[in-house]
């Protein structure tokens, strides 16, 4: 194995980039970059029935969007390709033949039905289901008989008995497995396609992968992969198994969990910022020293330390994600945020599909009002409802404000001045409110709160003169006149 750090993220194109897989990719990326190593993407595409047509493209597209630039993959061959498992059969076949020739593997002709009967009987006896080795020592005559019946064999690895398989996990510490608890397992399916645990060990060896960092749901795969390494006399890579991601109920994050968006594409579509999502995911199961939580990609690379990967489950905190993204939104220029929000404004029919310059100018002012509050670009639609919907019925607190003794006088003065105001812009609106203050003697909360409630129906909100400008003269006058 090379001294150079080489890690891999190996997705299957059977689905889109899940938040858990994105974390696996991200930690591999940070580990590689921290040690000036290589971040490799390998596509495990042997499950042809479940592969999505755009699954591979989607994986690459969303990894790139997150800022995870790879050093090697299907588009960057560095001498370790092919990078799709489906194109590596010529590498696997001689090794399969070698295991058969050395009696480290054998053909098994049992049908799915026979295996299921065995499995059910073991469960009924309270045993862990495992293959019982019925075809581990077939005679040549028996093999010929099964083939004459048209049975297609799978190929099983002959698991050495009474052995302990141990590895020093970079997250969990020492982990051991007793080989007697592992039945002879399939390395090649009946259709001739190598299974995951066989192919992945071969690929990691030939691609000189130094470290395998993945979710702890892969721990049980590790002894099988070590068996393959030992069968060929190869040195295994180092292993690290990250803790699970859990939801608010502290249950494993599931793709069926309706409370949490599961896929990077969904956050992208809502208008989250890639650097914010990078930051949030980097803190799922890893923590820096100190209290700071906002870091750039370059800072994460510099401070990343695999020893700080947590053994405890990582809590997916939606409020924390909203806060992190808001920190980044506040730092962005308004034009960037507006361009992210524009598709959402168009989809909600708040800006025409083919907007005029006037529409775009109005949209930019709207974003400027709410940018510091926004958790994601798409949130502009619910945040700014007062600009598009009829005024809601006032709450008790708002009603008390609008029923104030001086309100009719205030509204009469403000209405007449705003009605004559040209241009209807922030600077002029500010002047007008000051004039009303001088003429009526009403000031402070007695001045601003009734105006805000009258034009927005709310006690709090963005800067009042800016809000009045964005609402527009017609809407503001219509709302004021009922309180004159």
From Swiss-Prot:
Its EC number is 6.1.1.17. A motif ('KMSKS' region) lies at residues 252-256. ATP binds at residue 255. Its main location: cytoplasm. Keywords: Aminoacyl-tRNA synthetase, ATP-binding, Cytoplasm, Ligase, Nucleotide-binding, Protein biosynthesis. The keyword Iron-sulfur does not apply. PROSITE patterns: AA_TRNA_LIGASE_I. Monomer. Belongs to the class-I aminoacyl-tRNA synthetase family. Glutamate--tRNA ligase type 1 subfamily. This is Glutamate--tRNA ligase. It comes from Staphylococcus aureus (strain bovine RF122 / ET3-1). GO terms for molecular function: ATP binding; glutamate-tRNA ligase activity; tRNA binding; zinc ion binding. HAMAP family: Glu_tRNA_synth_type1 (MF_00022). It is found in: Cytoplasm. It catalyses: tRNA(Glu) + L-glutamate + ATP = L-glutamyl-tRNA(Glu) + AMP + diphosphate. A motif ('HIGH' region) lies at residues 11-21. The keyword Nucleotide-binding applies. Catalyzes the attachment of glutamate to tRNA(Glu) in a two-step reaction: glutamate is first activated by ATP to form Glu-AMP and then transferred to the acceptor end of tRNA(Glu). GO terms for biological process: glutamyl-tRNA aminoacylation. One of its GO terms (cellular component) is cytosol. Gene3D superfamilies: 1.10.10.350, HUPs. It is an enzyme of class 6 (ligase). It comes from the Bacteria.
């Amino acid at each position: 194995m090379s001294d150079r750090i080489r890690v891999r993220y190996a997705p299957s194109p059977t689905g889109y980039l899940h938040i858990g897989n994105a974390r696996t990719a991200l930690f591999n990326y940070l580990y590689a970059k921290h040690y000036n190593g290589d971040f490799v993407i390998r596509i495990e595409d042997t499950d042809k029935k479940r592969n999505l047509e755009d699954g591979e493209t989607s994986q690459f597209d969303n990894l790139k969007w997150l800022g995870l630039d790879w050093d090697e993959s299907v588009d960057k061959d560095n001498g370790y390709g092919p990078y799709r498992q489906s194109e590596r059969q010529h590498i696997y076949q001689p090794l399969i033949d070698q295991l058969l020739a050395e009696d480290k593997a054998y053909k098994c002709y049992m049908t799915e039905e026979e295996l299921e009967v065995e499995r059910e009987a073991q469960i009924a006896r309270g045993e862990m289901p495992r293959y019982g080795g019925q075809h581990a020592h077939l005679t040549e005559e028996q093999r010929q008989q099964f083939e004459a019946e048209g049975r297609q064999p799978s190929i099983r690895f002959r698991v050495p008995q009474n052995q302990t398989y141990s590895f020093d996990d970079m997250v969990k510490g020492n982990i051991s497995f007793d080989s007697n608890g592992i039945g002879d397992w399939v390395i090649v399916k009946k259709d001739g396609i190598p299974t995951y645990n066989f192919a992945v060990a071969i690929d990691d060896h030939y691609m000189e992968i130094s470290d395998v960092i993945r979710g702890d749901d892969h721990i049980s795969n590790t002894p099988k992969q070590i068996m393959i390494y030992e069968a060929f006399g190869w040195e295994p890579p180092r292993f690290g198994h990250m803790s699970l991601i859990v939801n608010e109920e502290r249950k494993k994050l599931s793709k069926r969990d309706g409370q949490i968006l599961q896929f990077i594409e969904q956050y992208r579509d809502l208008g989250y910022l890639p650097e914010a999502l990078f930051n949030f995911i980097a803190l799922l199961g890893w923590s820096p020293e100190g209290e700071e939580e906002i870091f750039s990609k370059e800072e994460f690379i510099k401070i990343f330390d695999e020893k700080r990967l947590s053994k405890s489950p990582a809590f997916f905190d939606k409020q924390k994600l909203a806060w992190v993204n808001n920190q980044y939104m506040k730092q962005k220029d308004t034009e960037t945020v507006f361009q992210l929000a524009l598709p959402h404004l168009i989809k909600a029919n708040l800006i025409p599909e083919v907007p005029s310059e006037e529409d775009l100018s109005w949209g930019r002012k709207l974003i400027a009002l709410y940018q510091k509050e926004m958790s994601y670009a798409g949130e502009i639609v619910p945040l700014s409802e007062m600009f598009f919907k009829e005024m809601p019925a006032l709450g008790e607190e708002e009603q008390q404000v609008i029923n104030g003794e001086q309100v009719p006088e205030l509204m009469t003065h403000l209405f007449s001045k705003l009605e004559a105001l040209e241009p209807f812009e922030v600077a002029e609106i500010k002047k007008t409110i000051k004039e009303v203050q001088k003429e009526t003697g009403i000031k402070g909360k007695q001045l601003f709160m009734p105006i805000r409630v009258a034009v927005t129906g709310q006690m709090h909100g963005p800067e009042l003169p800016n809000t009045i400008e964005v609402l527009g003269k017609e809407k503001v006058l219509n709302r004021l006149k009922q309180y004159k």
